[in-house]
């Protein structure tokens, strides 16, 4: 890269996820918010507030313990930290749940769960008695408001759903999206992914493989508060070394670079950041723009700074990632690359396709094309978004709010104190008809939790004003330090201008052209409305198409967030409940079951294996057995965490090898917990003999008391949709052949109480639909939900300086 700095002043410009440094610019009349290059100051907390906080924590934990005792639902921890999750984090997350009944637009229809049933609402069979209402959405990441269909774009999406296959998409369409998105981003090549998380995995893999081909040692240097997916992407590349530098500290970054270059001059150093830092000589620059793509200027942080007179050309970025859910309003992500990384990214993209990796759905790809071909529309949205976000920041700053985010950022972030304060703020906002997001430990300091207010370009000015006044009123009620009672009236709202008719004209013309393109593709790639898509016949296929059109009309293409604090779609809960009751044999063995959905099966499998490799309980050695034929996600997940003495990972080629290794272990450790990853179907179509596998393992245990626990992970990616009388997978087949009690019978009375059975799989492999799932006991799914939180994943995977 060029040694020229991207700044035209002597100021260092640092852009990250939530805390952006913005120097004063000539001619600016507005005050600059978040301008100090410093870590956020934690508000002072009195001894009385600390005591009240700990009393509140203890109360929540005791209530949860009483609930467990009353219902006789005994909690089984997956790992050591799960106790805090079960007795505290999960209960406070359930205090104010909301279920989304519509797309996550600026206004959203929700179903509110009464406080009398919030702790058990996931067990309710019928939500119809819970009241519905519309609220202002300031909690989702749909900043550009692109979840709403502009002009005639809804017709384009419906045509795509009817005429083209849902997934996998036509090859020609995928190629066109990669080419046009690369051109839009000013890069040489591009690859789409099923999530922003998987985009960062691909980006780091591309950088590491490039370094390996150059014969150089790859070193990743990350901001200490980078997104969890960045740390995960770095750590799964075991031949690379990962280091951190202080958050938003350019001086520490330059110091670390000098030290690394002095120690290893030939190293391939990759600086990976969220936003923009000053370029440094001979250093690779990787940018992740989860919250900036199609938000800041339309092409992320770089274009945002370019508009302010700074020299930061997109072409000088080596690798960039983006998240579509926070920009286009669709699930997915992308990676773009320049220079020598372009060829490696193209190679990785080809390998993923050859290995049958999940792909974005056809409608998402069409939506990407639709938006990036509307430059006037995007520019108008970006201008509107910045005006509204700046207005909110100005008003809150005037009222004394300590804004931590940058001026003009669509995420307005400020500290509110303890977790109790954050929870109360969330509750008070909901009561007043507003949804906001909260940041709590471990993502924030204990005494400085955050409220994150998300601004949409499509939020009306009236709702913007009401949102500001609500924040101030609630802050005063909660006695948040520094905020004074202030009421802003409509007369301060900025002047509004009529829409430019050329924007709609360009939009309609672009979508009409794309609609013709979709119709031409359907002649070669007919969709479910035109021919049957196995395992469905033609009438069923057409029924599925009509259901998808109705789903788009109700929910849009955009995703929702995790249930706790943010809210999730009612249809997601319905699917989870259907999955939880899918296998009577699993319920017969585990009791009450739950299911969990994932954006993509690869990331879900990675997180599942990562969680299962952590210490089980004190004094027990956790042994994980993995066949060498397991997928890359399984291997990466098992090796993600730092090595521990209490955990061992053993790979085997055949079951005989596993038995031999287990025989050695049984004499070396006094207490064992075994985790077996098993594929229910092999590549040749043969079915797993679970009974023989379990009996073979048990026969090698000289002392039955030595085995403290057994976890069976049944990967049904090759079974769901293919085997069983209902095509519901491995357990469906076993239930027909052996009855619903077969799990208990094969495990026996002594082993069954010690055994956790986890069923996981891929909707993509089964039905061509994006996503993965986990089905197990209610306690396992609960703790795994907590274990999958982004910050926890990053903490678990720490192993480098």
What are these regions (language model features)?
Residues 2-165, 495-557:
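N-terminal "arm"/small-domain region of PLP-dependent enzymes with the aminotransferase-like
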Residues 2-7, 148-150, 179, 183, ...:
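PLP-dependent enzyme catalytic core of the Aspartate aminotransferase-like
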Residues 79-80, 87-90, 99, 381-393, ...:
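Conserved PLP-binding catalytic core of the aspartate aminotransferase-like
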Residues 104, 113, 154-195, 545-598:
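Conserved N-terminal alpha-helix of the aminotransferase class I/II PLP-enzyme fold
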Residues 141-142, 243-293, 532-533, 645-713:
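Active-site phosphate-binding strand-loop segment of PLP-dependent enzymes
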Residues 206-228, 596-598, 608-632:
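Conserved PLP-anchoring active-site segment centered on the Schiff-base-forming lysine
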Residues 224-233, 447, 628-643:
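Short, glycine/polar-rich helix-capping loops at beta-to-alpha or helix-loop-helix junctions
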Residues 297-407, 414, 420-421, 711, ...:
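Active-site C-terminal subdomain of aminotransferase-like
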């Amino acid at each position: 890269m060029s040694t020229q700095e991207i700044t035209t002043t002597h100021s260092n410009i640092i852009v990250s996820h939530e805390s952006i440094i913005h120097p004063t610019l000539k001619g600016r009349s507005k005050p600059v918010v978040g301008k100090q290059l410093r870590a956020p100051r934690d508000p002072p907390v009195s001894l009385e507030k600390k005591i009240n906080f700990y009393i509140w924590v203890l109360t929540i934990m005791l209530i949860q313990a009483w609930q467990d005792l009353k219902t006789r639902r005994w909690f089984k921890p997956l790992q050591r930290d799960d106790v805090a999750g079960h007795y505290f984090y999960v209960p406070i997350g359930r205090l104010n749940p909301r279920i989304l009944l519509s797309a996550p637009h600026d206004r959203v229809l929700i179903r509110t769960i009464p406080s009398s049933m919030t702790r058990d609402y996931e067990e309710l069979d019928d939500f119809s008695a819970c009241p519905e209402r519309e609220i202002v959405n300031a909690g989702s990441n749909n900043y550009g408001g692109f979840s709403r269909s502009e002009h005639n774009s809804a017709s384009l999406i419906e045509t795509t759903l009817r005429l083209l296959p849902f997934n996998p998409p036509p090859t020609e369409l995928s190629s066109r999206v990669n080419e046009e998105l690369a051109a839009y981003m000013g890069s040489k090549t591009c690859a789409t992914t099923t999530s922003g998380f998987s985009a960062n995995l691909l980006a780091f893999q591309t950088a590491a493989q490039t370094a390996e081909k150059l014969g150089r040692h790859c070193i990743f240097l990350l901001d200490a508060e980078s997104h969890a997916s960045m740390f995960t992407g770095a750590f799964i590349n075991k031949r690379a070394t990962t280091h951190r530098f202080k958050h938003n500290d350019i001086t520490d970054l330059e110091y670390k670079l000098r030290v690394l270059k002095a120690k290893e001059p030939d190293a391939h150093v990759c600086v990976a950041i969220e936003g923009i830092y000053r370029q440094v000589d001979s250093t690779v620059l990787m940018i992740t723009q989860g919250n900036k793509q199609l938000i800041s200027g339309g092409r992320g942080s770089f274009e945002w700074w370019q508009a302010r007179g700074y020299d930061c050309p997109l072409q000088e970025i080596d690798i960039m990632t983006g998240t579509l859910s926070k920009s286009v309003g669709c699930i997915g992500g992308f990676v773009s690359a320049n220079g020598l990384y372009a060829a490696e990214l193209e190679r990785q993209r080809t390998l993923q396709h050859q290995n049958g990796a999940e792909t974005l759905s056809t409608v998402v790809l069409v939506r990407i094309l639709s938006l990036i071909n509307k430059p006037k529309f995007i520019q108008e949205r970006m201008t509107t978004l910045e005006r509204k976000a700046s207005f909110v920041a100005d008003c809150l700053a005037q009222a004394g709010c300590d804004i931590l985010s940058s001026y003009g950022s669509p995420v307005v972030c400020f500290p509110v104190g303890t977790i109790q304060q954050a929870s109360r703020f969330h509750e008070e906002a909901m009561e007043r008809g507003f949804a906001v997001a909260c940041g709590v430990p471990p993502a924030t300091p204990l005494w400085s939790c955050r409220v994150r207010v998300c601004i949409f370009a499509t939020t009306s000015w009236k709702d913007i004003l009401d949102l500001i006044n609500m924040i101030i009123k609630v802050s005063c009620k909660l006695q948040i330090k520094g905020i004074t009672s202030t009421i802003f009236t409509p007369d301060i709202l900025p002047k509004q201008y009529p829409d430019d008719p050329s924007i709609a004209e360009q939009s309609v013309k672009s979508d009409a052209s794309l609609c013709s393109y979709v119709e031409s593709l359907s002649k070669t790639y007919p969709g479910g409305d035109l021919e049957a898509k196995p395992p469905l016949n033609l009438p069923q296929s057409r029924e599925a198409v009509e259901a998808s059109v109705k789903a788009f009309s109700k929910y849009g293409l955009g995703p929702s967030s995790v249930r706790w604090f943010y809210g999730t779609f009612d249809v997601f809960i319905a699917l989870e409940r259907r999955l939880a009751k899918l296998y009577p044999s699993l319920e017969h063995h585990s009791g009450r079951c739950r299911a969990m959905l994932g954006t993509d099966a690869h990331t879900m499998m990675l997180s599942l294996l990562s969680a299962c490799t952590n210490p089980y309980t004190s004094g027990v050695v956790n042994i994980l057995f993995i066949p060498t034929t397991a997928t890359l996600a399984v291997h990466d997940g098992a090796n993600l965490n730092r090595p521990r003495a209490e955990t061992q990972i053993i790979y085997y080629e055949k079951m005989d090898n596993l038995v031999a290794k287990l025989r050695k272990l049984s004499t070396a450790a006094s207490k064992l917990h075994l985790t077996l990853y098993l594929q229910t179907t092999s590549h040749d179509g043969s079915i797993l003999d679970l009974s023989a596998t379990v009996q073979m393992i048990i026969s090698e245990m000289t002392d039955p008391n030595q085995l403290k626990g057994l976890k069976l992970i049944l990967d049904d990616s090759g079974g769901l949709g293919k085997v069983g009388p209902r095509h519901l997978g491995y357990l469906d087949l076993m239930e027909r052949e052996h009855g619903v009690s077969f799990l208990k019978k094969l495990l026996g009375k002594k082993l069954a109480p010690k055994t956790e059975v986890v069923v996981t799989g891929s909707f993509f492999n089964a039905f061509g639909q994006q996503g993965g799932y986990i089905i197990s006991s209610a306690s396992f799914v609960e703790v795994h939900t907590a274990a999958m939180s982004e910050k926890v994943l990053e903490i678990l995977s720490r192993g480098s300086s």
